[in-house]
């Protein structure tokens, strides 16, 4: 049922309540009441982003009527990437994808512990609350949104901001890895270095 199975060739990631769950979706548009999810992927990292484990990647089946409502940008982008063809061929529903993804994530972190991590992640969360509400509740209510650092860096350190070039693949898994790389970039060039490596293992605030 998955387009891409969970990776088994990466270093082992130990289950830890400080692990971070990264997520990205592709949608038919920007309005969760009228548009639908067409792809979803997850990646779990440790708290310092040194180890990453890829989860399954799902193209979510949607009707031709739903796909026909996409604007020109979405039709062009998702047609060029092959996603529209994958969506048409898929038999996976939002509910089935959510169930399998939650089972995968539970191997690495308990419900309610990880913030939802990604770029402009509030938009993904809006769609998840609409179409995958039980899965949305798996996450902590906080978000780890890399776009916050992006906007601050653009205003406070524009030269550093220009140093990270996005590839804009617009596929869920590629976008997740790009978000992780972007956060690593800001950590190295924009944020004050941590006093010690052990700082990342401190207990999170309530």
Curated annotation (Swiss-Prot):
Signal peptide: none
Main location: cytoplasm
UniProtKB keywords: Cytoplasm, Exonuclease, Hydrolase, Nuclease
Nuclease as UniProt keyword: yes
Exonuclease domain boundaries: 20-183
Active-site annotation: 141
Localization, UniProt: Cytoplasm
A Gene Ontology BP annotation from the UniProt entry: DNA metabolic process
InterPro entries linked: Exonuclease_RNaseT/DNA_pol3 (IPR013520), Oligoribonuclease (IPR022894), RNaseH-like_sf (IPR012337), RNaseH_sf (IPR036397)
EC nos: 3.1.15.-
Assigned GO CC terms: cytoplasm
Pfam family, one: RNase_T
Keyword presence, Acyltransferase: no
Gene Ontology molecular function, alphabetical: 3'-5'-RNA exonuclease activity; nucleic acid binding
Family: Belongs to the oligoribonuclease family.
Function: 3'-to-5' exoribonuclease specific for small oligoribonucleotides.
Alphabetized PANTHER family for the sequence: OLIGORIBONUCLEASE, MITOCHONDRIAL
Descriptive protein name: Oligoribonuclease
Gene behind this protein: orn
